[in-house]
Amino acid sequence: MDALDVSRWQFGITTVYHFILVPLTIGLAPMVAAMQTMWVITGKDSWYRLTKFFGKLFLINFALGVATGIVQEFQFGMNWSEYSRFVGDVFGAPLALEGLVAFFLESTFLGLWIFGWSRLPKLVHLATIWLVAIGVNASAFFIIAANSWMQHPVGAIYNEETGRAELTDIWALLTNNTALAAFPHAVAGAFLTAATFVAGISGWWMVREARKKKTENERGTLPADGVTPQAALPATDSRSMFRSAARMSFIVMIVAGGALAITGDIQGKLMFEQQPMKMASAESLCDTETGASFSLLTVGTHNNCESVVHLIAIPGLTSFLAENDFGATVQGVNQLQDQYEQQFGPGNYKPNLFVTYWAFRMMIGLAAGSALLAVAGLWVTRGGRIPDQKWFSWLSLLAIPTPFLANSAGWIFTEMGRQPWVVAPNLSGVDQIRLTVDQGVSDHPVGLVVASLVTFTLLYAALGGVWFYLLRRYVIEGPLDHDAHPHVDPPESEDDEPKQLSFAY
């Protein structure tokens, strides 16, 4: 491999590591805010305990997300200096807005939320977590706006004297139709991820506590159907508490899943228009077809169109996804390659067909894990029931990673499907604003890039291990006893000596 390949591997590995954490942060912040809102409205201590419990998990994820995200912006100057030189005037604007507006908003009010328990009025403290939720989603918008400019550049001109793109209209960049389509799709995926995370943990805790109570025989024999009515439990029972969180999450999962399908369809149709090569590669559609099918299973060497064989396919579905018409004509990879050679000169304009094809299907298929948990969860918790079936505990745990993997697959598809472009040409925009990966990479010795690849991969692996260890530890630990009742301050000491300031959440 040359320096270009290693640089791409490094950027891909660090981005996927970081993007595992991002959707959970985006979706979990408003869910924690909703839990705290329920506590403020109802006054039930169970919602307070849920807020503190899932708030702790949110803080762990947020901290590791910041740690892995800091390196991302430095990547552009490290291995992609030519890219930075070419688009710096444009790309820097949304990144600056993300840092100066969104990140400062979420960081400031997150600090107030952490230290504001028992110190701020209830409604003021509640407002801080909602502002955190707004901040993390605003941060996502600015990042997606920057990435969408790479997918579909608008609001810029090409300066022939400097040989780079220059921003002329920040509003056009922020209202780029690519960004407006991608943002709600990404947010829906984030809500699905967070809701599955909360539902999975809550489902596991419900079954764990129900089986524990059953074994200890503290409440007598359970009914024959293996569930305990919620009404039979005290209000502070952890089973009842986690059932409330699970039911809320199941509903969020269904709504987010529907939003994913709708926004995904909108974004897909836009990509057929703006990046037809990406969508043709997603289907391994080698030649132009009328009434193009959508394949569920394809075999062959996917980077060689001559060997691709579609074994199981749904007739006309790709055409429908492209233009809402089962008989529409969809351009194939070979024809688009010829078109791009005429328009942009000699070169290979085909992305990696194997990666784009399977990443697209993984993105869609893995969402089934969340759907299965939502449907099963609503059924086993119906009518106030609290499940103790072991299969539901396993389903809850196994469903948790599926939306994380689906989000990563979607991100890989989005980026790999754009190759070889790092700034894809806007076919109706400024012709000179385009850049391929080999034009954007830094001129570093391959050994230096390999060293940084190994270093960052090991560092991120260590951070990933810390992330998993902390989440696992505090999930198993569960809600703490001192969180059973809100706003309980420690007794005042008669000792007048000043104490060292400490923090514990």
Feature names for model-found ranges:
Residues M1-Y505:
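Polytopic transmembrane helical bundles with strong interfacial aromatic enrichment
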